[in-house]
Regions:
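Cytosolic regulatory regions of ion transport systems
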Residues: 2-575, 579-602, 644, 648-654, ...
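Short, motif-level signal for alpha-helix interfacial/capping segments enriched in acidic residues
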Residues: 486-491, 624-630
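C-terminal accessory/binding modules appended to enzymatic or scaffolding proteins
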Residues: 595-605, 609-616, 635
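Amphipathic, non-membrane alpha-helical rod segments
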Residues: 629-648
Length: 714
């Protein structure tokens, strides 16, 4: 094993090893000095003189005379240990400060700054230092006694204590030269305050450096705070862009011309003031909000889709229990409601168990003022109960999946053990999930829990901080790989000739989340598709041309004023011979019946409706006898298509958009189904990630890809 001198030095100065070394060197100095002088002076008669000379040597007086070879060696050894002692004292007093000062003074450029060294911040810092050693890391924490700070420095990072809201602290961090700034204090309000302070410091420092863009990542536990974040973004760009071209230099040139023209025209009207607003990119800060609890829910349902252990093709109902309703429980519920839409059309039933269920119910409805019961386009049933009811004799009998989201992991383990002990008769075909945050060791414990000496319980850990707080997740957005590529692929199909590389970063958080949910619902659709393909044994229902024609009549045609308007370009994406086409669509149209494709499209419609409802959208009312004024109103959050599947075709007749051909909006949901294979192959060049048992992707994705590949290669 290669000796790492730098790592040893860091371990030395940031651990108790330095204190121990200082103590040992001090003791050995006294011992050998006293021994040497005692040999010269006499052990008893010269005791006081030897003690005095030992103290003098310890303080740096090396002027001594030794006639005996043993005393001479002893005194020289004492001098060596004295030097080590003083080195330890120096390192104790100044070593840490000098190392940090040297970095801040000369190397704090293009570095990563993490604000907050709590459990989440420490997990991220540790991941960066262990797996991304080319990165320079600087951490600030408000607590000077935080043990994680020393641990970060020992691993090779740099850390200081201070309040990042303070402008002086931000300047000390050289925040204006940072490559990335990640706010993970553990409290939303603190993260927002730091962000606000950063938006004041950076524009001042960067006014002469317009190309120095900053990427800020802010952890927000509550989705309500995304609205506050939007206000900060708007304030940071509060200059309304009445002059806005693609380049700042063009804006400046126009402004310069205006300042020359206006004074001449207004010389006889001195009170006629002009307000000119100019868009400058130099004031832009790229801000991305994230939640590790959303990451946890995302990994859970990508690996283990809702209803994984239920027959959702025929008559099975998915009954989900969420135990503990804090940040993790809320994120799990949000994703469950957004994704829990099945082939058989049955609503998702969710019960939240919490020891303060009435309060949590009220808080949930403040955040999501939605109906809790299935009706109209609502396709879920939600109930809140006291968590004690889960431990009744038949408490878990009706549930398929039970997800423990308590902040106290030990309490969750105890609850599971109690259920196994008292309700063993109801454990068959049940899945238990446990949120483990920083307790990675729970994985092994969960895997070892048994009903008896032979039969294990299916307990699946999720949400370990080492995974959901990693650099690849927080910064590189690795979990969004499929969503990003699906969005780019959509634009390739429908807007050929444009650039897609930076498209994702320009999307609002709402649209980014919309793409995520579309991709994350894919495993639930694929469960049905895989069963349909197996059931059909790869037999063709129709010749492709016949299937395409019937599909066009069913979903792409629209009767307007007794004339049939067909969106032929959209369905031609299934089998284009030139340019971009939807990979795999032709196979799905041939091997799955149109009735089943429509059921899958209805699933997608239910999912799309649920996502918009959860995000505060309502149905845009249609004026009687008139067309819709718009397809959607972003300000009021009203959408004309927030209706049932059966109403889509009729509503499509009254949506008229400038420059766009009339369109049967049923085809949009059908296209999402037909893009299933395309989404997968466009995101993954090979099957390695999909085959990896440790990846976040469920077996349904790889199984589906294999089936389509086999048909293609027939």
């Amino acid at each position: 094993m290669k000796f790492d001198l730098k790592r040893y030095y860091r371990s030395f100065i940031y651990s108790n090893l330095n204190d121990t070394t200082m103590l040992i060197c001090g003791i050995l100095t006294v011992f050998f000095s006293f021994l040497g002088h005692s040999i010269e002076n006499g052990f008893f008669s010269g005791f006081l003189k030897s003690a005095y000379q030992t103290l003098a040597l310890l303080l740096g007086n090396y002027d001594f005379k030794a006639t005996n070879i043993v005393s001479k060696c002893s005194l020289y050894i004492a001098i060596v240990f004295t030097l080590f002692f003083y080195c330890s004292v120096f390192i104790k007093l100044l070593g840490k400060k000098l190392r940090t000062w040297f970095f801040l003074k000369f190397f704090a450029k293009n570095h990563i700054v993490i604000c907050g060294a709590g459990d989440m911040g420490y997990a991220l810092a540790k991941d960066i230092l262990n797996k991304h050693q080319d990165k320079k890391l600087l951490v600030v924490d408000i607590n000077p006694t935080n043990d994680n700070v020393n641990s970060i420095c020992t691993l090779g990072g740099y850390a200081i204590s201070g309040n990042a809201i303070d402008k002086d602290v931000l300047n000390k961090l050289n925040i204006t030269k940072a490559e990335k700034i990640i706010l993970m204090t553990g409290k939303d309000i603190s993260n927002l305050e730091i962000l606000d302070a950063i938006t004041k410091v950076i524009p001042e420092a960067d006014k002469n450096d317009p190309d120095n863009k900053k990427n800020v990542y802010i952890h927000l536990e509550s989705k309500e705070n995304y609205e506050i974040l939007q206000s900060i973004k708007e304030k940071e760009n509060d200059k309304v862009s009445l002059i806005k071209t693609r380049k700042d230099i063009s804006n400046s040139e126009i402004l310069d011309a205006i300042t020359k023209v206006i004074p001449k025209a207004d010389k006889n009207d001195p009170d006629n003031k002009k307000n000119v607003y100019i868009h400058l990119k130099s004031s832009m800060i790229n801000i991305r909000a994230f939640s590790v609890y959303d990451n946890a829910a995302q990994t859970l349902f990508m690996k283990h889709p809702i209803g994984e252990n239920v027959d959702t093709i025929d008559n099975g109902s998915v009954n989900l229990a969420i135990v503990g309703f804090d940040a993790a429980g809320l994120s799990v519920l949000y994703r469950a409601l957004a994704l829990g839409h099945f082939f058989n059309g049955k609503p998702l039933n969710v019960t939240i168990f919490d020891n303060n269920h009435e309060k949590k119910r009220a808080e949930f409805l403040k955040l999501y003022p939605i109906s809790l019961k299935a009706s109209g386009i609502i396709n879920w049933n939600i109930d809140f109960k006291d968590d004690g009811r889960l431990f009744n004799k038949d408490g878990i009998e009706n549930f398929n999946q039970i997800i423990f989201c308590k902040t106290n992991v030990q309490a969750s383990l105890t609850d599971i053990a109690r259920i196994i002990k008292n309700q063993s008769a109801h454990l068959e075909n049940k899945q238990f999930f446990i949120f483990i945050d920083k307790h990675d060791g729970i994985k092994g414990i969960a895997n070892d829990i048994k009903i008896d000496s032979k039969n294990k319980v299916d307990i699946i850990p999720f949400g370990n901080f080492s995974q959901i707080c990693s650099y690849d997740v927080v910064v590189n957005e690795i979990y969004d790989k499929m969503a990003i590529r699906a969005d780019q692929r959509y634009n390739e199909l429908h807007n050929p000739g444009t650039k897609y590389e930076t498209k994702w970063n320009t999307l609002s958080p709402f649209l980014q989340d919309s793409n995520r949910m579309q991709v994350e619902h894919l495993p639930i659709k694929l469960k049905a598709i895989n069963k349909l393909l197996s059931k059909n044994k790869f037999l063709e229902y129709l010749e492709y041309d016949e299937a395409k024609e019937k599909a066009r009549n069913r979903w792409f045609d629209l009767m307007l004023n007794d004339q049939n308007v067909s969106d032929i370009n959209e369905i031609n994406l299934w089998d284009k011979t030139e340019g971009a086409k939807i990979e795999g669509a032709k196979i799905l149209a041939t091997y799955i019946s149109l009735d089943d494709i429509e059921k899958l499209a209805k699933m997608e419609k239910h999912r799309w409706n649920a996502f918009h409802i959860l995000n505060g959208w309502t149905t845009l009312p249609k004026p009687e006898g008139q067309n819709y004024p718009d397809r959607k109103d972003n300000n009021k959050k009203e959408h004309a298509l927030l209706i049932g599947w059966d109403e889509l075709e009729e509503a499509s007749k009254y949506i008229v958009e400038d420059g766009k051909k009339p369109h049967n909006y049923k085809s949009d949901d059908v296209e999402t189904v037909m893009r299933a294979y395309d989404m997968i192959v466009s995101a993954f060049e090979d099957d390695k990630i999909l085959q990896d048992e440790n990846s976040i992707y469920c077996k349904e994705i790889f199984e589906f890809k294999q089936k389509i590949d086999r048909i293609k290669n027939k």
